[in-house]
């Protein structure tokens, strides 16, 4: 297993696998909802896009793939990066998907514009392992990287708002935001 995501409304978990397929499981009944073989490369990242009935997944063949999780039909497939896709984040309200890659970049994709790349964020010096939107400011997101940093960005800006040197000797494998409203 390479990645995992939980559906926001259904009792489902999405699992992305080294074997090149994805599986959706019902964690209440412990039964498989769907299995979709995608490619011969590991699938490292995946997310539900519940408002569209989609899953979006990224793999080691550099492609971003989108499938309808109810029918299993492919919506689209395209080369998103020239290297492995490590992480995916879905914007909470806008038609945006972020991808983080071993090519040292984060890209912002717009599915309402035929999956056009709206922006490429550069500045990391190693593999981008994780991306996450800020639930309290959805114009902002963070990226975590093996260059020991977390960068916080704003959509539409070419440079990060700031960079945190997270570790002296270890890379950053995961970033996330606190989702509840009881803290700033």
Where are these regions (language model features)?
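Beta-propeller domains
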Residues: 17-33
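Conserved strand-to-loop turn within each blade of WD40 beta-propeller repeats
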Residues: 16-19, 58-61, 93, 99-103, ...
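WD40-repeat beta-propellers
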Residues: 4, 22-26, 64-68, 88, ...
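WD40/WD-repeat beta-propeller blade-loop signature
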Residues: 9, 32, 42, 51, ...
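Loop/turn segments within WD40 beta-propeller blades
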Residues: 5-10, 46-52, 89-95, 113, ...
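WD40/WD-repeat beta-propeller blade N-cap
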Residues: 1, 37-43, 79-85, 121-128, ...
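Beta-strand-rich domains and repeat architectures in extracellular enzymes and scaffolds
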Residues: 1-20
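A short beta-strand motif characteristic of beta-propeller blades
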Residues: 31-36, 73-78, 115-121, 159-164
